[in-house]
């Protein structure tokens, strides 16, 4: 009978199997295309198992994975790690509680990242509890040092971040929690798209309701995610013109700009 692994870290085999499984799920969900995306798991105090560069996440095998140290230097494996590994390493460095990181380009969430719209509206109890708000990191060239620098401020307080004009990154206590947050992020973005841009109406949760959900989150041992602002009045948009972003933040920006111009006359 095999001995159960009592370490807080997965064995190499366990981690490799989990990464391959999550890679397939990301691919089948349409969160990645071609060779996009990357996944990593912390397998020791100074070791990370991660996905290789130039490989479709839907067709990975355990043998393709590569082990690196916290500086990104290869320890073992016949492949090269992704150039975006720096982003993963920064999350681990900023938040010691994190044990896994996922990065992908889920289409709806990425569209919000391109539009510059944070996922911060309290419309779904599950999103408040399991995911929290999702900020946007400033644009940085993929693979450059600017990417990890751009996400560093968000790694401790939040569970994920949108990358401007790029995609999304999520993290967690294991790779499945990190992946499920990626799923939640895309679902949350999709509902926001329907209510904000298509239906044009969303009844947001009140401050009191949000506080109750945050307390539930705390009891579940989740102390990260940020807190969305409550909006006690119904949010309704009458104009569904396709050439406008019907999202609160954009409308407020435009309104403020118009008022400034009016006052200056």
Where are these regions (language model features)?
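Glycine-rich flexible loops
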Residues: 1-265
